[in-house]
């Protein structure tokens, strides 16, 4: 039998992409409320390893954030 002090390693469950699935929201540059969830408090786009967004959807998200910034819907920098 194993040591009494030995424990099973903790396995973190892999998060799934919030933009894939049946009722997933569409990435739209006009939806600033949705986009703000993926922008940090300083105004930077949060990386996919933190938000668990797939690579394809992360590219779409970055494109939507940049387009919203250009049109004045999102700020470039939050102070």
Swiss-Prot record:
One of its GO terms (cellular component) is cytosolic small ribosomal subunit. GO terms for biological process: translation. One of its GO terms (molecular function) is small ribosomal subunit rRNA binding. InterPro entries: Ribosomal_bS18, Ribosomal_bS18_CS, Ribosomal_bS18_sf. The keyword Ribonucleoprotein applies. The keyword rRNA-binding applies. Binds as a heterodimer with protein bS6 to the central domain of the 16S rRNA, where it helps stabilize the platform of the 30S subunit. HAMAP family: Ribosomal_bS18. Belongs to the bacterial ribosomal protein bS18 family. Part of the 30S ribosomal subunit. Forms a tight heterodimer with protein bS6. This is Small ribosomal subunit protein bS18. It comes from Nitrobacter winogradskyi (strain ATCC 25391 / DSM 10237 / CIP 104748 / NCIMB 11846 / Nb-255).
